[in-house]
Amino acid sequence: IAQIKRHPDYARVGMVLCHQGVVRATSRDGRPVRGLRVAVNLDRLRQVVAANKQRPGIVEILVSIDSDRDLKVGDDVMLLLVAGDIRENVIAALSATLDAIKTQVTHKTEYFT
């Protein structure tokens, strides 16, 4: 958030929305998980962020993904911050960016107990 507040266009920001992805103890289908590993396509990530920064009202998008190492339950996986003018624009941009990251940028390997 401090980095966003230093953005030269911060005066246009009316909302900062954050997604913090965490390793949970169960998979989507309910199986117990002991951890996971995430691989990231960095070129595609840059493209996704650049495209979504062009959405109406968006000032900044910042992403950090903890990749290429084993993560355990409770570890942070991803932090995504979207700053923009109004709620509707910021929520739409966060949703679109997150969906694109999950479907086009990252590959997750879960380790089951």
Task: Kindly give the residue locations of the regions a language model identified.
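N-terminal, polar/charged subdomain of small-to-medium soluble alpha/beta proteins
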Residues: 1-77, 83-113
